[in-house]
Structure formats: structure tokens, C-alpha cells
């Protein structure tokens, strides 16, 4: 049985893996990393992607690598994009296929 699960958003991950276990509110996190509360709220609500600035602030605050949060955002964005263009991408030829077609047309 193939069940579809949408990619976890950065906001869901941030909330579930960091904020809830540590008892952090959006207000406290925003205040501590010196960003507007609305920025954190929008990230949590999946209305805003994580910027480099936010990713670096979160990485410093939570003691992760500089790449941790931006890599997470990249993975989430990639999975979302794949869902949108999957069928079109699959219908495109590969480089090898175009080369083979070119060889056959010259024969």
C-alpha cells in the first residue's frame, strides 16, 4: 500500500524537535535570536521559507552546524518541487537518450 505523506515543513520540524521539547514559544525564540515574532510565526505556519539569516541564527542558538537548518529547508523545498513537476520531469529525455536518437537519425 503506497501512502502519500507530504514533506514535513521546516516549521513543523522546528516546533516538534526544538521548541516543544525545550518549552520555547515563538515570542521567546524570536526575542532570543533578535528577529520579529512574525518571522517565527510565519515559519511555523509554513507561510515563509527559512532565510539564510534565520538559518544561521537558529543554528547558533540551538548549537547545530551552520548548514543544519538551511540544509533542512533545501530538502523540504526540493521534495515539494518534485511533487509539482514529477510527471513533466519524468517525460523529459535524458542526455543519453538524445544522443542515441541523434546517432540513429544520422545512420
Where on the chain are the PLM-derived regions?
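Key DNA-contact positions within bacterial/archaeal DNA-binding proteins
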Residues: 27, 38, 67
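Alpha-helical residues within the helix-turn-helix
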Residues: 20, 31, 42, 60
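Short, basic-rich loop-to-helix N-cap that marks the start of a DNA-contacting helix
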Residues: 47-60
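Short alpha-helical "recognition helix" segments of helix-turn-helix
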Residues: 25-30, 58
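A short, Lys/Arg-rich alpha-helix, primarily the initiator
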Residues: 1-24, 71
Amino acid at each position: 500500500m503506497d501512502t502519500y505523506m507530504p514533506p514535513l515543513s521546516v516549521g513543523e520540524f522546528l516546533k516538534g524537535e526544538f521548541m516543544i521539547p525545550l518549552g520555547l514559544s515563538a515570542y521567546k525564540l524570536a526575542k532570543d535570536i533578535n528577529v520579529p515574532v512574525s518571522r517565527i510565526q510565519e515559519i511555523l505556519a509554513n507561510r515563509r521559507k527559512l532565510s539564510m539569516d534565520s538559518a544561521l541564527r537558529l543554528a547558533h542558538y540551538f548549537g547545530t552546524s551552520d548548514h543544519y537548518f538551511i540544509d533542512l529547508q533545501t530538502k523540504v523545498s526540493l521534495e515539494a518541487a518534485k511533487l509539482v513537476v514529477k510527471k513533466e520531469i519524468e517525460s523529459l529525455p535524458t542526455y543519453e537518450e538524445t544522443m542515441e536518437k541523434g546517432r540513429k537519425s544520422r545512420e
